Amino acid sequence: MRCPYCGNEDTQVKDSRPTEDNTAIRRRRFCTACGGRFTTFERVQLRELTIIKTNGRRVPFDRDKLMRSVQIAMRKRPVEQERIERMVSGIVRRLESMGESEIPSAMIGKLVMEGLSSLDAVAYVRFASVYRNFREAKDFEEFLGELSGPLGSSLRDEDEDR
């Protein structure tokens, strides 16, 4: 494994252990050239996935990009990182087990919306605002009006707490 600090290819694994949800192996590594320490994760990849963007362009699936998108929606929300990681791992497993190698980006957005709806109502609305391309305040109002059940009531409860 190449050192991210100096580019040296001679690194040593100092510690390996499974992640808490057993979906990856976490490895602590040490660079023999610069002494840098870094962590890598090894995950099972069932198949190569290609995402079909709304403009028709095809790009390789990037789990890290999915995680970044979810973390942006979850920023400053009281949700443990482990729960976010489990949600993202679940989405990836669902995508890989669909049997398709090409997946529309809208499908990923739908799966993220499903996951966020049970994780955090505010993050759900944040993600929806980007996913559904909200342009004006009325777009938020219409979306919030569509919400019903526990998610809608939890958003209203948070609003009343302020």
From Swiss-Prot:
GO biological process: negative regulation of DNA-templated transcription
Zinc finger (unnamed) in chain: 3-34
Compositional bias of kind Basic and acidic residues: 11-21
Keyword hit for Chaperone: no
Cofactor, free-text remark: Binds 1 zinc ion.
Thylakoid listed as a keyword: no
Cofactor: Zn(2+)
Family: Belongs to the NrdR family.
Biological role: Negatively regulates transcription of bacterial ribonucleotide reductase nrd genes and operons by binding to NrdR-boxes.
Protein's recorded name: Transcriptional repressor NrdR
Gene: nrdR
